[in-house]
A protein has these predicted regions:
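Terminal targeting signals and extreme-terminal segments of soluble enzymes
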Residues: 1-141
């Protein structure tokens, strides 16, 4: 028998993280969730540094992308990214504790537009923008 029980918005990111070994490797933790918004955090580790001894640009991008994906899916439908971009504002260092908060700016039947702020404390270090396509598939328990 198929499970037709829908997951509540705040449970969807938890399920997504449990199925996401890459985000687990990054050490991402979910801090806050509500429909259309998700805040996550992680700490930059030595193995995340590039040849200049700064965090690889993909680290901030990956944190932002995870927050974006989690927030986009809180509407209960599988949502997949179709376009993303990031502005790296400040270099990141080993030991930096980063947060990324994704807020949906506009959502339609099929598309959702998000802004993600990546911060080190109160300092904005990256700004990510993303568009998702919302499928008809429901998140279920």
């Amino acid at each position: 028998m198929e499970n037709t029980s829908h997951l509540p918005p705040n449970e969807i990111p938890k399920k997504m993280l449990s199925l996401d070994p890459f985000s687990q490797w990054l050490g991402i933790k979910i801090l806050e969730v509500e429909k259309g918004r998700c805040k996550v955090a992680m700490t930059v580790r030595k193995e995340m540094l590039n040849s200049m001894n700064k965090a690889h640009g993909g680290i901030a991008y990956s944190l932002a992308d995870t927050a974006f994906g989690f927030a986009a899916n809180t509407h209960g439908k599988y949502a997949v990214s179709i376009e993303t971009s990031i502005n790296h504002i400040e270099a990141l260092n080993e030991g930096d504790y980063l947060t990324a908060e994704s807020v949906i700016e506009k959502v339609g039947n099929k598309l959702g537009f998000h802004i993600v702020e990546v911060k080190r404390g109160e300092e904005l270090v990256a700004l990510f923008k993303g568009v998702v396509y919302r499928t008809s598939k429901d998140w279920k328990e």
